[in-house]
């Protein structure tokens, strides 16, 4: 797992270059948002279970066929698996948010997930929608914690949805 700083250093080291203005600006932005990132993580951590439960409720309200007989979240076991996965997305998105880098999502969550879901018959569309709902709820939670600029919260969730979404459709 890398954070924004180690990724930047690695890229410049591989190229054998000193930091240029872009690198310095990237570092400055990362460190300037550091306190907000930690505060956001604290707000998420203190309400993680409620955020997942609320996201699940909203998802099933929007897509009730998922919890009806024959739906992918029908039966207690499948519903629990869906909420467990949403919790994983939230936890790893929080790690990526603090790191300022989505590398942990690629390494620990996304590699092979789409193929696994397809092989198990888990619909990707509702999964993507669930992550989008989580993003909206987290932004509300973070704003409620007094963090004015919540745009940095979007990137981990947007990364998950981009990587899971259909391509070349």
UniProtKB/Swiss-Prot annotation:
Annotated keywords: Antenna complex, Bile pigment, Chromophore, Electron transport, Membrane, Methylation, Photosynthesis, Phycobilisome, Thylakoid, Transport
PTM section of the record: Contains one covalently linked bilin chromophore. The chromophore is added by phycocyanobilin lyase CpcS 1.
Topology in membrane: Peripheral membrane protein
Superkingdom field: Bacteria
Compartments where found: Cellular thylakoid membrane
GO terms, biological process: photosynthesis
Entry keyword annotation includes Ribosomal protein: no
InterPro entries xref list: Allophycocyanin_b, Globin-like_sf, Phycobilisome_asu/bsu, Phycobilisome_asu/bsu_sf
Binding locations of (2R,3E)-phycocyanobilin: 82
Keyword Ribosomal protein: no
Residues modified as N4-methylasparagine: 72
GO CC field: phycobilisome; plasma membrane-derived thylakoid membrane
Gene3D superfamilies named among the record's database cross-references: Phycocyanins
Function description: A variant beta-allophycocyanin (AP) which forms a complex with ApcE, a phycobilisome terminal emitter that influences energy transfer to photosystem II.
PANTHER family per the UniProt record, alphabetical: ALLOPHYCOCYANIN BETA CHAIN, PHYCOBILISOME 32.1 KDA LINKER POLYPEPTIDE, PHYCOCYANIN-ASSOCIATED, ROD 2-RELATED
Subunit structure comment from the entry: Heterodimer of ApcE and this beta chain.
Protein family (similarity comment): Belongs to the phycobiliprotein family.
Name of the protein: Allophycocyanin subunit beta-18
Organism: Nostoc sp. (strain PCC 7120 / SAG 25.82 / UTEX 2576)
UniProt gene name: apcF
